[in-house]
Amino acid sequence: MSIKSDKWIRRMAEEHKMIEPFVPDQVRASEDGRRIVSYGTSSYGYDIRCADEFKIFTNINSTIVDPKNFDEGSFVDFKGDVCIIPPNSFALARTVEYFRIPRTVLTVCLGKSTYARCGIIVNVTPFEPEWEGYVTLEFSNTTPLPAKIYANEGVAQVLFFESDEVCDVSYADRGGKYQGQRGVTLPKT
């Protein structure tokens, strides 16, 4: 299994719509020249952006967090350019980009150091072979202070690994529960 380069990422995005919308280069400034958290194609990965729709976790109901029976009422929906995550809490969001992962590919997604150095951890599980959809992102604020997440800017980097052989059963073959997800998606069992 080998990591794929910027050339491969560009080719797969342009010829097979692996990433939509696709940015072929690294963007480091907004159209008005303001510095932003970078996004787009890098040497051996693709820096994804966070869309402007968020679910911010609050514990107003003193709920027990149960991944098998998650209380949707524990979230406040928010739409905007900047999301404030409460201290020691988390928020969910989705990517701007829609992904279509080839059958021979598995991805690993890592948070950007800009956020990590501020105590904001980005968690995303691997994109499995033949999975497609918008990626649900989880942001943990590990600090005792409120923390900002910026919509439409880079939040994490996706690394693409291609196997030497095709898997017997892909995510699509087994009817994965998050296949084709469109918005911020809560836990499913």
UniProtKB/Swiss-Prot annotation:
Any Pfam family hit: DCD
Catalytic reaction(s) noted: dCTP + H2O + H(+) = dUTP + NH4(+)
Keyword S-adenosyl-L-methionine appears in the UniProt entry: no
Protein's organism: Burkholderia multivorans (strain ATCC 17616 / 249)
GO-annotated biological processes: dUMP biosynthetic process; dUTP biosynthetic process; nucleobase-containing small molecule interconversion
Active site: 138
Annotated protein name in UniProt: dCTP deaminase
Domain of life, source organism: Bacteria
InterPro entries found in the cross-reference section: dCTP_deaminase, dUTPase-like_sf, dUTPase_trimeric
Subunit structure: Homotrimer.
GO molecular function: dCTP deaminase activity; nucleotide binding
Hydrolase recorded as keyword: yes
UniProt: dCTP binding residues: 112-117, 136-138, 157, 171, 181
Described purpose of this protein according to its UniProt entry: Catalyzes the deamination of dCTP to dUTP.
Functional pathway: Pyrimidine metabolism; dUMP biosynthesis; dUMP from dCTP (dUTP route): step 1/2
Keywords attached to this entry: Hydrolase, Nucleotide metabolism, Nucleotide-binding
Protein family (similarity comment): Belongs to the dCTP deaminase family.
PANTHER family, alphabetized: DCTP DEAMINASE
SUPFAM superfamilies assigned: dUTPase-like (SSF51283)
Enzyme Commission number(s) from the entry: 3.5.4.13
HAMAP family, per the entry: dCTP_deaminase (MF_00146)
